[in-house]
Design a protein with these regions (language model features):
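N-terminal prepro regions of secreted peptide precursors
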Residues: 4-137
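Short intrinsically disordered terminal tails
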Residues: 1-3, 162-166
């Protein structure tokens, strides 16, 4: 059974490809690994994307279900002061952008460069793909900035956790 993540699905990433869901072979082998380790080899294919999906979905769930006043406490990260609420929002925004960029960069390459006919069909069926492909500037500088912000989002998450556990 393929895992479903409501928050990742809201980004427009199809369930069939996020996480390790794109791998369908060796089911018995994966079941044994899940029994032994609690996860299987699909989770380590692309660890940065697996972590991004985990962080994004958990921060969204925290934001949706938090009963605390997250504006009262603040953390300092990279010389800036963030309330917990601002930090969570910043993490969600930048991690979501990293996930969308990775997914849509693959789509851009596949559906614009390699298979333009399939790309036209995909754009008709999935408006999010069409909008993103039309509006996004495909520059290497964007990729490095998005990746840097994702790395900072991970650091900010650690900073929040240190504050919460102390």
């Amino acid at each position: 059974m393929k895992r479903r993540n409501q928050y990742i699905s809201q980004l427009g990433v199809p369930r069939r490809i996020y996480g390790g869901n794109f791998v369908t072979e060796k089911k018995l082998y994966r079941m044994r690994q899940r029994y032994r380790y609690g996860f299987d080899y699909r989770d380590i294919f692309n660890m940065d994307m697996s972590y991004a999906e985990w962080l994004y979905s958990h921060m969204r769930m925290y934001k949706d279900n938090s009963v605390h006043d997250d504006t009262m406490a603040a953390v300092i990260f990279d010389g800036k002061e963030y309330t917990i609420q601002e930090a969570v929002d910043w993490i969600i925004e930048n991690t979501g952008e990293f996930i969308r960029y990775g997914y849509y960069l693959d789509i851009h390459f596949d559906y614009i460069t390699r298979y333009p006919l399939i790309g036209k069909m995909m754009s008709k069926f999935n408006p999010a793909v069409r909008t993103y492909l039309q509006e996004y500037e495909w520059l290497e500088d964007n990729e490095s900035q998005i990746t840097d912000n994702f790395i900072k989002a991970g650091g900010l998450f650690i900073e929040i956790m240190q504050y919460c556990w102390l």
